[in-house]
Amino acid sequence: MFEIKKICCIGAGYVGGPTCSVIAHMRPEIRVTVVDVNESRINAWNSPTLPIYEPGLKEVVESCRGKNLFFSTNIDDAIKEADLVFISVNTPTKTYGMGKGRAADLKYIEACARRIVQNSNGYKIVTEKSTVPVRAAESIRRIFDANTKPNLNLQVLSNPEFLAEGTAIKDLKNPDRVLIGGDETPEGQRAVQALCAVYEHWVPREKILTTNTWSSELSKLAANAFLAQRISSINSISALCEATGADVEEVATAIGMDQRIGNKFLKASVGFGGSCFQKDVLNLVYLCEALNLPEVARYWQQVIDMNDYQRRRFASRIIDSLFNTVTDKKIAILGFAFKKDTGDTRESSSIYISKYLMDEGAHLHIYDPKVPREQIVVDLSHPGVSEDDQVSRLVTISKDPYEACDGAHAVVICTEWDMFKELDYERIHKKMLKPAFIFDGRRVLDGLHNELQTIGFQIETIGKKVSSKRIPYAPSGEIPKFSLQDPPNKKPKV
């Protein structure tokens, strides 16, 4: 059997960096080189301050960096030396042309394929790590076949990642499954078994699933679509709970105890974010439309529509509760990452909520423990989010949560950071304008509602009526509409 001794990973982002760091950590006899065209990112991987935050990542990197784990911008040499090349580059949603807003843009995948074939000789395994549409491996293989050389043998596999940001290291060390797809030919199966051997040193063999390439590619899209669907489903129930007096947490517990349903991903919130869910569901929608399956496409589109609705509904609730206007009012936004234990802001609900409130003239004071100021400014300065001077006029980045809440009309919790449960809310209430509102978009304060009401807060949360003496207001009856799907037409201001 072919033995993999050297691995090259093209792409040092949220997938490539942690994945290959764990492989190097678990397989010290394999030399792992992570390469990227972004020199500043590679410099960060080689520094004490890593470019991404992930619990446990720093310890893993430091245990093997400089020994059998290397980060470099020398892409060509790393490809030439490798037995296995992971393609772990971005596959963003297209922002222009056919499939705009839904189809995956595979330009980086294609560029990798061309660079790999240019720098390869002999036998090499090329593996998709990036989330790609079905039959992307076929496109890679066609590029290889069109640029073949004597004695060149490139085998293409699919090995999608199933890690979740915030628990990536745990997921990589103890995965639910490892999925490897390859050609159903002797050469293809030889490559599959070689990659299986890499994982078998720490992953039980029964957790390593082998399929054909197309099943592997579709399984990744389907997995993310099912998870997103669960969140949209419970969020739809949260709207019903708010209208009837039910508590969505109690409903979720009741249905989650049914073993046929299970209790995971039944946490109602202001909406899902991150780099994968929306992108992959929209990719699935586009695939269904391209295959003339309009009913299937509409079914999955509703998952995205419900997520957008949940965000608009939450923003409308903030505005309505504050006497139908937030113009010139200070609003504290606690949390900007799309979930706790990560600094990733891609498709974060905080961006959308901030957009709605800025459009109404609110002054936002934003705090997040792991998202840099520059990233928040870039996200909110996107042409699809704000006008040229909106961010400079309406947004302040605070150094701590108390500064953000000082003098605020309302506190809006958008990320479920554990630290928000431990804040001194009496101190916060004293410094806020009265009536003081808390809008808990992540249900992180569920156990504190009585205490917070005793302090004097008006509490609004997802999927539950809390405040017994709610301040009367005149509802606008209007839920704002907004999309980040429009293509950028200018560079964001920092």
Swiss-Prot record:
Regulation: UDP-alpha-D-xylose (UDX) acts as a feedback inhibitor. It binds at the same site as the substrate, but functions as allosteric inhibitor by triggering a conformation change that disrupts the active hexameric ring structure and gives rise to an inactive, horseshoe-shaped hexamer.
Enzyme class: oxidoreductase
GO terms for biological process, alphabetical: chondroitin sulfate proteoglycan biosynthetic process; gastrulation with mouth forming second; heparan sulfate proteoglycan biosynthetic process; neuron development; protein hexamerization; UDP-glucuronate biosynthetic process
Keywords per UniProt: Acetylation, Allosteric enzyme, Carbohydrate metabolism, NAD, Oxidoreductase, Phosphoprotein
Disulfide bonds: none
Active-site residues (renumbered): E161 (proton donor/acceptor), K220 (proton donor/acceptor), C276 (nucleophile)
Annotated Pfam families: UDPG_MGDP_dh, UDPG_MGDP_dh_C, UDPG_MGDP_dh_N
GO cellular component annotations of the record: nucleus
Reactions this protein catalyses: UDP-alpha-D-glucose + 2 NAD(+) + H2O = UDP-alpha-D-glucuronate + 2 NADH + 3 H(+)
Residues modified as N6-acetyllysine: K107
Residue numbers spanned by region Important for formation of active hexamer structure: 321-325
Keyword presence, NAD: yes
Summary of subunit composition and partner proteins: Homohexamer.
Name of protein: UDP-glucose 6-dehydrogenase
Gene name, Swiss-Prot/TrEMBL: UGDH
